[in-house]
Swiss-Prot record:
GO terms for cellular component: small ribosomal subunit. One of its GO terms (molecular function) is rRNA binding. CDD domains: S4 (cd00165). GO terms for biological process: ribosomal small subunit biogenesis; translation. Belongs to the universal ribosomal protein uS4 family. SMART domains: Ribosomal_S4 (SM01390), S4 (SM00363). Keywords: Ribonucleoprotein, Ribosomal protein, RNA-binding, rRNA-binding. Part of the 30S ribosomal subunit. Contacts protein S5. The interaction surface between S4 and S5 is involved in control of translational fidelity. This is Small ribosomal subunit protein uS4. It comes from Lactiplantibacillus plantarum (strain ATCC BAA-793 / NCIMB 8826 / WCFS1). PANTHER family: 30S 40S RIBOSOMAL PROTEIN, SMALL RIBOSOMAL SUBUNIT PROTEIN US4M.
Length: 202
């Protein structure tokens, strides 16, 4: 399955959550496309609820189905901790997500484009693979020639707060993952246990 590249507001309304994190998609019409008000759709089945939760998280991080499933399998091989929580931590450690968390981009989609176009380095070396797994202590930076890009400077200026598990130097436009995040620091609107149940039934 290919990555969705259409308007994020359509998916946000269908899933009932803001993929951009701004809430703008749901401000005017907080119901799915095609519906003309709340309460028109029937109650989801158990499978439907699990599938919906999986789609919410997958769309939030912008992964293809294969990427998402492979990362879930990888999380299952981690011996310590819960499968679902480990999965969410692996999603957080993706380079495109770290660029977003550091405030170098306003959305994960924008962050992925910055990585793809070669604007980002890890420990001084250019990395153009969005799925690159960032380790604690590695330094994620903007390439010197890219530091004046309006999309980056604008994003940094718009940041209100950053997660407690990252640190950022606004002068150098670089930051790092200082520790692995705790579950309560990750997406509160996601029930990862439903995603584990979904894949366990396949």
């Amino acid at each position: 399955m290919s990555r969705y590249t259409g308007p994020s507001w359509k998916i946000s309304r269908r899933l009932g959550m803001s993929l951009s994190g701004t809430g703008k998609e749901l401000a005017r019409r907080p119901y799915a496309p095609g519906d003309h008000g709340q309460g028109r759709r029937g109650k989801l089945s158990e499978y439907g609820t699990q599938l919906r939760e999986k789609q919410k998280l997958r769309m939030m991080y912008g992964l293809t189905e294969r990427q998402f499933a492979n990362l879930f399998i990888k999380a299952g091989k981690i011996r310590e901790g819960k499968h679902g929580v480990n999965f969410m931590i692996l999603l957080e450690r993706r380079l495109d997500n770290m660029v977003y968390r550091l405030g170098l981009a306003t959305t994960r989609r924008q962050a992925r484009q910055l990585v793809n176009h070669g604007h980002i380095t890890v420990d001084g070396k250019r990395v153009d693979i969005p799925s690159y797994e960032v380790s604690v202590g590695q330094v994620v930076s903007v390439r010197e020639k890219s530091k004046k890009l309006a999309v980056i400077t604008g994003a940094v200026e718009a940041v209100v707060a950053r997660p407690n598990f990252v640190q950022f130097d606004a002068d150098k436009l670089e930051g790092s993952l200082t520790r692995l995040p705790e579950r309560e620091e990750l997406e509160a609107d996601i029930d990862e246990s439903l995603i584990v149940e979904y894949y366990n039934k396949l």
